[in-house]
Amino acid sequence: MNGRASALLPVGNDDSAPAALRVGEEIDDDIALVVTTSGTTGTPKGAQLTAAALTASADATHDRLGGPGRWLLALPSYHIAGIQVLVRSLLAGTVPVELDVSTGFDINQLPSAVDELGPGRRYTALVATQLAKALDDPAAAAALAGLDAVLIGGGPAPRPVLDAAARAGVNVVRTYGMSETAGGCVYDGVPLDGVQVRVDADGRIALGGPTLAKGYRNAPDPDPFVEPGWFRTDDIGVVDDSGVLSVLGRIDDAISSGGLTVMPQPVEAALRTHPAVADCAVFGLADERLGQRVAAVIVVADGCAAPSLEALRAHVMRTLDHTAAPREMHVVDALPMRGIGKVDRSALVRLTGNSLS
């Protein structure tokens, strides 16, 4: 972390990014780590993180959570969320307890792993799918309830999962951030100390501050780092009068239907309140009349029959405009994922045999 060694490039066993990121070629002396992004298309990019950015993120996290402690590593150590567990542990002078997730998230191992953390302040970081799985097991849920905080990132956590966590006594902290910001930089809608947030005229979220990466390895055009000190994300959001950020979704996930814009996240939140829907994803499909129509893929809850499209539309229209109600529905056993905790919407489009536009 002193900036004098070679920059590290953490990758999974099947990651094809190293060649694209020019491994072995010259890089700025202050770059400690190059973390590949999990974009769905195009050439892999690498967020160039300095030791200063990594430590600023870790220190700000501990300040927000109430102090350093011991961490349970339950995410891949080649993703930024797992990397930050290691950095936080290093700065705290502790050794993390590792839960092997190479073959999946085994909730049966969770209670003993939490016990191994010992006394004092104890934390972990998960994605929403891991949290949901743990909450279905009483022993795993009780183990999480014994932690001082469970950070949730990798995408928004469904409201039913957050409600279940609250009932189980699990202190969930919702995080927003990415590799380009050295991990989560906004906790429960509030920026960490030093982090700057603004929403531009087009609704796009921009982030700044000491946790920011020093640009990309293999920078795209246009470069979201082009404005000094800022990173323009692909996310749409709003900031309320209290300075709390709400992330509405990704700009490329927006559905243009009949001249109106529909963001998938509110529709997904409405669908998840239907008793027969265990999980879902919403996306746009090409439509000759509307431009795009709203489509939904659902995972049916155990013990329930698949709801009809008409029933789902009526359910959504209880809280949202009729434009947001799905016009097409598909049932799957599980949602395809990319990265950690992120639905692969492009795979869903291919699954339906349609096109985006």
Residue ranges and their predicted role:
Residues M1-V34, T43-G46:
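Nucleotide 5′-phosphate-binding alpha/beta core
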Residues D321-K342:
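AMP-binding/adenylate-forming catalytic domain of the ANL superfamily
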Residues T37-T40, W71, L86, T124, ...:
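Conserved S/T- and glycine-rich ATP-binding loop of Class I adenylate-forming
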Residues G209, I236-A324:
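AMP-binding/adenylate-forming catalytic core of the ANL superfamily
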Residues P191, D200-P228, L260-V262:
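Conserved ATP/PPi-binding loop(s) of AMP-dependent carboxylate-activating enzymes
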Residues D136-D188, R198:
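Gly/Ser/Thr-rich phosphate-binding loop
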Residues D30-D59, G66:
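Conserved AMP-binding A3 loop
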Residues A51-D59, R70-K133, V173:
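AMP-binding/adenylate-forming
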